Protein backbone atom coordinates (compact mmCIF):
# COMPACT_ATOMS: atom_id res chain seq x y z
CA UNK A 1 0.00 0.00 0.00
CA UNK A 2 1.53 3.31 -1.01
CA UNK A 3 0.81 6.18 1.33
CA UNK A 4 2.39 8.84 -0.84
CA UNK A 5 -0.02 11.57 0.15
CA UNK A 6 0.22 10.92 3.86
CA UNK A 7 2.23 13.12 6.17
CA UNK A 8 5.61 11.42 6.49
CA UNK A 9 6.29 10.55 10.13
CA UNK A 10 9.54 11.47 11.87
CA UNK A 11 10.38 7.76 12.11
CA UNK A 12 9.14 5.11 9.69
CA UNK A 13 9.11 1.66 11.28
CA UNK A 14 8.20 -1.36 9.19
CA UNK A 15 6.17 -4.18 10.76
CA UNK A 16 8.05 -7.29 11.84
CA UNK A 17 6.43 -9.27 9.03
CA UNK A 18 7.94 -6.82 6.53
CA UNK A 19 11.49 -7.90 7.41
CA UNK A 20 13.33 -9.05 4.26
CA UNK A 21 13.27 -12.86 3.87
CA UNK A 22 16.13 -12.86 1.36
CA UNK A 23 19.41 -11.00 0.92
CA UNK A 24 19.99 -9.32 -2.44
CA UNK A 25 23.14 -10.13 -4.42
CA UNK A 26 23.87 -7.06 -6.58
CA UNK A 27 26.55 -8.97 -8.51
CA UNK A 28 23.76 -10.84 -10.32
CA UNK A 29 22.72 -7.57 -12.00
CA UNK A 30 26.24 -6.34 -12.79
CA UNK A 31 27.24 -6.64 -16.45
CA UNK A 32 30.90 -6.36 -15.47
CA UNK A 33 31.33 -8.76 -12.57
CA UNK A 34 33.92 -7.97 -9.89
CA UNK A 35 37.25 -9.61 -10.71
CA UNK A 36 37.73 -12.94 -8.87
CA UNK A 37 39.78 -13.34 -5.69
CA UNK A 38 43.20 -14.80 -6.52
CA UNK A 39 45.31 -17.33 -4.66
CA UNK A 40 48.26 -15.27 -3.30
CA UNK A 41 50.77 -17.99 -4.24
CA UNK A 42 49.59 -19.00 -7.74
CA UNK A 43 47.67 -15.86 -8.82
CA UNK A 44 44.90 -18.18 -10.09
CA UNK A 45 41.24 -17.60 -9.13
CA UNK A 46 40.50 -19.01 -5.66
CA UNK A 47 38.56 -22.26 -5.64
CA UNK A 48 35.81 -23.14 -3.17
CA UNK A 49 38.18 -25.62 -1.55
CA UNK A 50 40.90 -23.00 -1.05
CA UNK A 51 38.49 -20.44 0.40
CA UNK A 52 37.01 -23.10 2.69
CA UNK A 53 40.35 -23.39 4.53
CA UNK A 54 39.93 -19.79 5.69
CA UNK A 55 36.13 -19.26 5.66
CA UNK A 56 33.10 -21.39 6.53
CA UNK A 57 32.10 -23.43 3.48
CA UNK A 58 28.65 -21.86 3.04
CA UNK A 59 30.18 -18.37 3.27
CA UNK A 60 32.85 -19.33 0.73
CA UNK A 61 30.00 -20.37 -1.61
CA UNK A 62 28.31 -16.98 -1.10
CA UNK A 63 31.64 -15.28 -1.79
CA UNK A 64 31.94 -17.00 -5.18
CA UNK A 65 28.29 -16.66 -6.23
CA UNK A 66 27.87 -13.75 -8.62
CA UNK A 67 24.77 -15.02 -10.46
CA UNK A 68 22.04 -15.78 -7.87
CA UNK A 69 20.08 -12.53 -7.32
CA UNK A 70 18.32 -13.49 -4.08
CA UNK A 71 19.58 -15.77 -1.30
CA UNK A 72 17.19 -17.00 1.40
CA UNK A 73 17.86 -15.80 4.94
CA UNK A 74 17.69 -18.81 7.32
CA UNK A 75 14.83 -18.59 9.84
CA UNK A 76 17.27 -18.68 12.80
CA UNK A 77 18.92 -15.50 11.50
CA UNK A 78 15.54 -13.82 10.96
CA UNK A 79 14.64 -14.67 14.57
CA UNK A 80 17.83 -12.96 15.75
CA UNK A 81 17.21 -9.95 13.46
CA UNK A 82 13.85 -9.45 15.19
CA UNK A 83 15.67 -8.41 18.39
CA UNK A 84 16.71 -5.12 16.78
CA UNK A 85 15.08 -4.96 13.34
CA UNK A 86 13.35 -3.58 11.38
CA UNK A 87 15.48 -0.47 11.90
CA UNK A 88 13.87 2.95 11.48
CA UNK A 89 14.09 5.19 8.44
CA UNK A 90 14.12 8.69 9.93
CA UNK A 91 13.11 11.97 8.31
CA UNK A 92 15.57 14.54 9.68
CA UNK A 93 12.98 17.29 10.11
CA UNK A 94 14.95 19.02 12.88
CA UNK A 95 18.20 19.04 10.89
CA UNK A 96 16.38 20.33 7.78
CA UNK A 97 14.90 23.18 9.82
CA UNK A 98 18.27 24.07 11.39
CA UNK A 99 19.89 24.17 7.94
CA UNK A 100 17.01 26.11 6.40
CA UNK A 101 17.17 23.88 3.35
CA UNK A 102 14.39 22.93 0.93
CA UNK A 103 16.01 19.47 0.69
CA UNK A 104 14.36 16.49 2.34
CA UNK A 105 16.86 14.51 4.41
CA UNK A 106 16.38 10.89 5.48
CA UNK A 107 18.68 8.53 7.33
CA UNK A 108 18.57 4.80 7.96
CA UNK A 109 19.56 4.33 11.61
CA UNK A 110 21.47 1.12 12.33
CA UNK A 111 22.54 1.94 15.91
CA UNK A 112 19.62 0.28 17.72
CA UNK A 113 21.57 -2.64 19.18
CA UNK A 114 24.32 -3.16 21.75
CA UNK A 115 27.06 -3.36 19.13
CA UNK A 116 26.00 0.19 18.21
CA UNK A 117 26.15 -0.38 14.47
CA UNK A 118 25.08 -2.22 11.31
CA UNK A 119 27.80 -4.83 11.85
CA UNK A 120 25.45 -7.22 13.66
CA UNK A 121 23.60 -7.88 10.37
CA UNK A 122 26.53 -9.89 9.03
CA UNK A 123 27.98 -11.07 12.37
CA UNK A 124 24.94 -13.23 13.11
CA UNK A 125 24.95 -14.65 9.57
CA UNK A 126 28.63 -15.59 9.68
CA UNK A 127 28.37 -17.03 13.20
CA UNK A 128 25.28 -19.03 12.18
CA UNK A 129 27.09 -20.73 9.27
CA UNK A 130 30.11 -21.45 11.49
CA UNK A 131 27.88 -23.08 14.11
CA UNK A 132 26.00 -25.04 11.45
CA UNK A 133 29.33 -26.38 10.18
CA UNK A 134 30.12 -27.68 13.67
CA UNK A 135 33.08 -25.38 14.29
CA UNK A 136 34.43 -24.54 17.76
CA UNK A 137 34.89 -20.87 17.11
CA UNK A 138 35.86 -17.98 14.87
CA UNK A 139 38.62 -15.38 14.73
CA UNK A 140 38.38 -11.82 13.47
CA UNK A 141 39.84 -8.33 13.43
CA UNK A 142 38.20 -5.13 14.61
CA UNK A 143 39.11 -1.46 14.21
CA UNK A 144 36.97 0.78 16.37
CA UNK A 145 35.43 -2.31 17.94
CA UNK A 146 31.90 -2.32 16.50
CA UNK A 147 32.52 -5.41 14.41
CA UNK A 148 34.25 -7.24 17.27
CA UNK A 149 31.34 -6.36 19.57
CA UNK A 150 28.79 -7.53 17.01
CA UNK A 151 30.60 -10.81 16.47
CA UNK A 152 30.99 -11.45 20.20
CA UNK A 153 27.22 -10.92 20.61
CA UNK A 154 26.45 -13.37 17.80
CA UNK A 155 28.92 -15.95 19.15
CA UNK A 156 27.50 -15.67 22.68
CA UNK A 157 24.00 -16.22 21.28
CA UNK A 158 25.10 -19.36 19.39
CA UNK A 159 27.67 -20.70 21.89
CA UNK A 160 30.80 -20.22 19.78
CA UNK A 161 34.33 -19.19 20.82
CA UNK A 162 35.28 -15.70 19.63
CA UNK A 163 38.88 -14.46 19.28
CA UNK A 164 39.28 -10.79 18.36
CA UNK A 165 42.45 -8.96 17.26
CA UNK A 166 41.78 -5.27 17.89
CA UNK A 167 43.84 -2.54 16.20
CA UNK A 168 46.20 -1.32 18.93
CA UNK A 169 45.35 2.41 18.77
CA UNK A 170 41.63 1.59 19.16
CA UNK A 171 42.37 -0.97 21.90
CA UNK A 172 43.99 1.86 23.85
CA UNK A 173 41.55 4.65 22.87
CA UNK A 174 38.40 2.56 23.41
CA UNK A 175 38.83 0.38 26.52
CA UNK A 176 35.07 0.29 27.14
CA UNK A 177 34.32 -1.28 23.79
CA UNK A 178 36.92 -3.92 24.58
CA UNK A 179 35.07 -4.63 27.85
CA UNK A 180 31.73 -5.00 26.07
CA UNK A 181 33.35 -7.71 23.92
CA UNK A 182 34.69 -9.44 27.01
CA UNK A 183 31.26 -9.21 28.64
CA UNK A 184 29.98 -11.21 25.68
CA UNK A 185 32.72 -13.78 26.24
CA UNK A 186 35.22 -12.77 23.57
CA UNK A 187 39.00 -12.99 23.94
CA UNK A 188 40.46 -9.61 22.85
CA UNK A 189 44.11 -9.02 21.91
CA UNK A 190 45.74 -5.74 20.77
CA UNK A 191 47.22 -6.01 17.26
CA UNK A 192 49.99 -6.32 16.26
CA UNK A 193 50.54 -8.87 19.03
CA UNK A 194 53.27 -11.34 19.92
CA UNK A 195 50.78 -14.24 19.64
CA UNK A 196 51.22 -14.78 15.91
CA UNK A 197 54.20 -15.03 13.56
CA UNK A 198 52.89 -12.20 11.41
CA UNK A 199 52.34 -10.02 14.51
CA UNK A 200 55.93 -10.57 15.64
CA UNK A 201 57.15 -9.73 12.13
CA UNK A 202 55.14 -6.46 11.92
CA UNK A 203 56.28 -5.45 15.44
CA UNK A 204 59.90 -6.05 14.41
CA UNK A 205 59.54 -4.11 11.15
CA UNK A 206 57.53 -1.20 12.62
CA UNK A 207 58.50 -0.86 16.31
CA UNK A 208 55.89 1.03 18.33
CA UNK A 209 53.27 0.80 15.55
CA UNK A 210 49.66 1.62 16.45
CA UNK A 211 48.49 -1.12 14.09
CA UNK A 212 46.01 -1.18 11.22
CA UNK A 213 43.03 -3.22 10.08
CA UNK A 214 45.19 -4.93 7.46
CA UNK A 215 47.60 -6.04 10.17
CA UNK A 216 44.83 -7.30 12.49
CA UNK A 217 43.30 -9.28 9.60
CA UNK A 218 46.64 -11.06 9.01
CA UNK A 219 46.80 -12.09 12.66
CA UNK A 220 43.21 -13.32 12.73
CA UNK A 221 43.69 -15.38 9.55
CA UNK A 222 46.90 -16.94 10.88
CA UNK A 223 45.17 -17.75 14.16
CA UNK A 224 42.23 -19.42 12.36
CA UNK A 225 44.33 -21.46 9.96
CA UNK A 226 46.68 -22.75 12.69
CA UNK A 227 43.91 -23.82 15.12
CA UNK A 228 41.72 -26.85 14.42
CA UNK A 229 37.96 -26.16 14.35
CA UNK A 230 38.30 -22.40 13.78
CA UNK A 231 37.58 -20.23 10.75
CA UNK A 232 38.15 -16.57 10.01
CA UNK A 233 35.23 -14.14 9.63
CA UNK A 234 35.40 -10.47 8.79
CA UNK A 235 33.27 -7.38 9.09
CA UNK A 236 33.63 -5.71 5.71
CA UNK A 237 35.21 -5.76 2.23
CA UNK A 238 34.10 -9.25 1.14
CA UNK A 239 31.08 -9.77 -1.10
CA UNK A 240 29.42 -12.08 1.46
CA UNK A 241 29.42 -9.23 4.01
CA UNK A 242 27.85 -6.78 1.55
CA UNK A 243 25.25 -9.47 0.79
CA UNK A 244 24.20 -9.80 4.46
CA UNK A 245 24.16 -6.03 4.87
CA UNK A 246 21.51 -5.66 2.15
CA UNK A 247 18.93 -6.36 4.87
CA UNK A 248 19.37 -2.66 5.68
CA UNK A 249 19.01 -1.42 2.10
CA UNK A 250 16.02 -3.69 1.43
CA UNK A 251 14.20 -2.39 4.51
CA UNK A 252 15.01 1.16 3.43
CA UNK A 253 13.64 0.54 -0.06
CA UNK A 254 10.42 -0.98 1.32
CA UNK A 255 9.93 2.02 3.63
CA UNK A 256 10.56 4.45 0.75
CA UNK A 257 8.09 2.64 -1.50
CA UNK A 258 5.48 2.53 1.26
CA UNK A 259 5.53 6.32 1.58
CA UNK A 260 6.29 7.22 -2.02
CA UNK A 261 9.76 8.55 -1.17
CA UNK A 262 12.18 8.71 -4.11
CA UNK A 263 15.78 9.51 -3.08
CA UNK A 264 17.77 11.61 -5.54
CA UNK A 265 21.04 10.79 -3.85
CA UNK A 266 22.14 8.04 -1.49
CA UNK A 267 25.21 8.68 0.64
CA UNK A 268 27.25 6.32 2.79
CA UNK A 269 30.60 6.31 4.56
CA UNK A 270 33.07 3.86 3.08
CA UNK A 271 35.94 2.04 4.76
CA UNK A 272 35.80 -1.47 3.37
CA UNK A 273 32.31 -0.94 1.99
CA UNK A 274 29.93 -3.07 4.10
CA UNK A 275 27.51 -0.33 5.12
CA UNK A 276 27.59 1.53 1.81
CA UNK A 277 27.18 -1.67 -0.20
CA UNK A 278 24.36 -2.90 2.02
CA UNK A 279 22.48 0.39 1.84
CA UNK A 280 22.79 1.08 -1.88
CA UNK A 281 22.64 -2.44 -3.41
CA UNK A 282 18.83 -2.68 -3.83
CA UNK A 283 18.75 0.83 -5.35
CA UNK A 284 21.87 0.12 -7.43
CA UNK A 285 20.11 -2.99 -8.80
CA UNK A 286 17.36 -0.74 -10.20
CA UNK A 287 19.98 1.52 -11.76
CA UNK A 288 21.84 -1.46 -13.28
CA UNK A 289 18.58 -2.87 -14.70
CA UNK A 290 17.68 0.56 -16.11
CA UNK A 291 14.54 0.87 -13.96
CA UNK A 292 15.47 4.01 -12.01
CA UNK A 293 18.31 6.46 -11.55
CA UNK A 294 20.01 7.53 -8.35
CA UNK A 295 23.20 9.39 -7.49
CA UNK A 296 25.38 7.31 -5.17
CA UNK A 297 28.15 8.96 -3.13
CA UNK A 298 30.81 7.10 -1.15
CA UNK A 299 32.43 9.23 1.56
CA UNK A 300 35.88 8.35 2.87
CA UNK A 301 38.40 9.99 5.21
CA UNK A 302 41.02 12.21 3.57
CA UNK A 303 43.58 10.34 5.71
CA UNK A 304 42.72 7.00 4.05
CA UNK A 305 41.42 7.86 0.56
CA UNK A 306 41.29 4.55 -1.33
CA UNK A 307 38.61 5.46 -3.91
CA UNK A 308 39.65 9.06 -4.47
CA UNK A 309 43.43 8.59 -4.55
CA UNK A 310 44.03 4.85 -4.78
CA UNK A 311 44.81 2.69 -7.79
CA UNK A 312 42.48 0.03 -9.24
CA UNK A 313 44.54 -3.13 -9.11
CA UNK A 314 45.00 -6.51 -7.47
CA UNK A 315 46.30 -6.18 -3.93
CA UNK A 316 46.44 -8.08 -0.66
CA UNK A 317 43.48 -7.54 1.66
CA UNK A 318 45.86 -7.59 4.63
CA UNK A 319 49.29 -6.31 5.65
CA UNK A 320 50.79 -9.77 6.17
CA UNK A 321 49.88 -10.86 2.63
CA UNK A 322 48.19 -14.10 3.68
CA UNK A 323 44.66 -13.35 2.41
CA UNK A 324 43.57 -13.82 -1.21
CA UNK A 325 44.32 -11.00 -3.63
CA UNK A 326 41.35 -8.80 -4.51
CA UNK A 327 41.01 -6.36 -7.39
CA UNK A 328 40.00 -3.11 -5.75
CA UNK A 329 40.80 0.55 -5.28
CA UNK A 330 43.73 0.42 -2.91
CA UNK A 331 46.48 2.51 -1.34
CA UNK A 332 48.65 -0.61 -1.02
CA UNK A 333 48.35 -3.19 1.75
CA UNK A 334 51.44 -1.86 3.53
CA UNK A 335 49.82 1.59 3.90
CA UNK A 336 49.31 2.34 7.60
CA UNK A 337 46.99 5.34 7.96
CA UNK A 338 47.46 7.99 10.63
CA UNK A 339 45.73 7.17 13.92
CA UNK A 340 42.65 9.17 12.98
CA UNK A 341 39.43 8.87 14.94
CA UNK A 342 37.27 6.92 12.51
CA UNK A 343 38.88 3.56 13.26
CA UNK A 344 36.28 1.73 11.19
CA UNK A 345 37.33 3.52 8.00
CA UNK A 346 41.09 3.01 8.31
CA UNK A 347 41.32 0.36 5.59
CA UNK A 348 43.71 0.52 2.63
CA UNK A 349 41.32 -1.06 0.10
CA UNK A 350 37.66 -1.19 -0.87
CA UNK A 351 35.12 -3.93 -1.59
CA UNK A 352 35.72 -5.35 -5.09
CA UNK A 353 31.96 -5.01 -5.81
CA UNK A 354 31.97 -1.28 -4.99
CA UNK A 355 35.34 -0.85 -6.71
CA UNK A 356 33.91 -2.30 -9.94
CA UNK A 357 30.75 -0.15 -9.73
CA UNK A 358 32.87 2.96 -9.07
CA UNK A 359 35.23 2.06 -11.91
CA UNK A 360 32.23 1.66 -14.26
CA UNK A 361 30.89 5.10 -13.29
CA UNK A 362 27.79 4.01 -11.36
CA UNK A 363 28.83 5.94 -8.24
CA UNK A 364 31.07 8.80 -7.17
CA UNK A 365 33.35 9.29 -4.16
CA UNK A 366 34.45 12.16 -1.95
CA UNK A 367 37.03 12.44 0.78
CA UNK A 368 36.47 14.65 3.82
CA UNK A 369 38.75 15.87 6.62
CA UNK A 370 38.05 14.74 10.14
CA UNK A 371 37.62 18.19 11.73
CA UNK A 372 34.82 18.96 9.23
CA UNK A 373 33.34 15.52 9.95
CA UNK A 374 33.17 16.19 13.71
CA UNK A 375 31.66 19.63 13.10
CA UNK A 376 28.88 17.86 11.18
CA UNK A 377 28.59 15.22 13.92
CA UNK A 378 28.01 17.87 16.60
CA UNK A 379 25.49 19.73 14.47
CA UNK A 380 23.62 16.46 13.92
CA UNK A 381 23.77 15.50 17.62
CA UNK A 382 22.38 18.89 18.63
CA UNK A 383 19.51 18.79 16.14
CA UNK A 384 18.58 15.11 15.79
CA UNK A 385 19.35 13.94 19.32
CA UNK A 386 21.57 11.02 18.33
CA UNK A 387 25.31 10.99 19.05
CA UNK A 388 26.66 9.63 15.76
CA UNK A 389 29.70 7.40 15.31
CA UNK A 390 32.69 9.15 13.69
CA UNK A 391 32.39 6.75 10.74
CA UNK A 392 28.70 7.61 10.13
CA UNK A 393 29.51 11.29 10.48
CA UNK A 394 31.42 11.19 7.19
CA UNK A 395 28.06 10.59 5.49
CA UNK A 396 26.42 13.31 7.60
CA UNK A 397 29.08 15.79 6.44
CA UNK A 398 28.28 15.24 2.76
CA UNK A 399 24.50 15.09 3.38
CA UNK A 400 24.72 18.52 5.04
CA UNK A 401 26.93 19.85 2.22
CA UNK A 402 24.41 18.67 -0.38
CA UNK A 403 21.47 20.09 1.60
CA UNK A 404 23.27 23.46 1.74
CA UNK A 405 23.77 23.38 -2.04
CA UNK A 406 19.98 22.91 -2.32
CA UNK A 407 19.56 25.98 -0.11
CA UNK A 408 21.57 27.99 -2.65
CA UNK A 409 19.82 26.61 -5.75
CA UNK A 410 16.34 26.21 -4.25
CA UNK A 411 16.18 22.57 -5.38
CA UNK A 412 14.02 20.23 -3.30
CA UNK A 413 16.25 17.18 -3.54
CA UNK A 414 15.61 14.07 -1.47
CA UNK A 415 18.83 13.03 0.28
CA UNK A 416 19.19 9.63 1.95
CA UNK A 417 22.19 8.58 4.02
CA UNK A 418 23.19 5.69 6.23
CA UNK A 419 23.62 6.44 9.93
CA UNK A 420 25.65 3.34 10.67
CA UNK A 421 25.86 3.67 14.42
CA UNK A 422 26.30 5.58 17.64
CA UNK A 423 29.41 7.27 19.01
CA UNK A 424 29.16 6.62 22.76
CA UNK A 425 32.53 4.85 22.87
CA UNK A 426 34.20 7.51 20.75
CA UNK A 427 34.41 10.18 23.43
CA UNK A 428 38.20 10.49 23.15
CA UNK A 429 37.61 11.69 19.59
CA UNK A 430 34.82 14.08 20.58
CA UNK A 431 37.03 15.36 23.42
CA UNK A 432 39.90 16.07 21.00
CA UNK A 433 37.48 17.97 18.76
CA UNK A 434 35.94 19.94 21.65
CA UNK A 435 39.41 20.81 23.00
CA UNK A 436 40.52 21.97 19.51
CA UNK A 437 43.28 19.37 19.54
CA UNK A 438 42.10 17.49 16.46
CA UNK A 439 44.20 17.83 13.32
CA UNK A 440 43.65 16.85 9.71
CA UNK A 441 46.28 14.52 8.40
CA UNK A 442 46.37 14.01 4.66
CA UNK A 443 49.00 11.63 3.26
CA UNK A 444 51.32 13.08 0.62
CA UNK A 445 51.58 11.59 -2.87
CA UNK A 446 55.10 10.48 -1.92
CA UNK A 447 53.80 8.56 1.11
CA UNK A 448 51.14 6.85 -0.98
CA UNK A 449 53.69 6.01 -3.67
CA UNK A 450 55.78 4.08 -1.14
CA UNK A 451 52.97 1.65 -0.30
CA UNK A 452 51.68 1.48 -3.89
CA UNK A 453 55.13 0.59 -5.19
CA UNK A 454 55.19 -2.41 -2.84
CA UNK A 455 51.99 -3.89 -4.26
CA UNK A 456 52.13 -7.35 -5.88
CA UNK A 457 52.54 -7.49 -9.65
CA UNK A 458 49.64 -9.44 -11.13
CA UNK A 459 49.34 -9.90 -14.90
Regions found by a protein language model. Give the residues of each.
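Positively charged, low-complexity intrinsically disordered leader regions
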Residues: 5-135
Amino acid sequence: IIMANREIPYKIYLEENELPRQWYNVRADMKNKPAPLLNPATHQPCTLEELSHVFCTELAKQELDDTTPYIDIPQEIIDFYKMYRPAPLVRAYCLEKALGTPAKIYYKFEGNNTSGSHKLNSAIAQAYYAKKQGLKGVTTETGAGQWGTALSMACAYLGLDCKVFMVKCSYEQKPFRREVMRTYGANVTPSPSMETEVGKKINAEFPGTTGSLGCAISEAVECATTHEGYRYVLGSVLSQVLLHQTVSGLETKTACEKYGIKPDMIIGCAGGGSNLGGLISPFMGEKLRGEADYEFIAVEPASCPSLTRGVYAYDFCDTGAVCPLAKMYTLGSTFIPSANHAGGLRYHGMSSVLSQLYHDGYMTARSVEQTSVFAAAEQFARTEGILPAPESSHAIRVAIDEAMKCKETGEEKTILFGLTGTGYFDMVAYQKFNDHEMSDYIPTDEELKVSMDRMPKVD
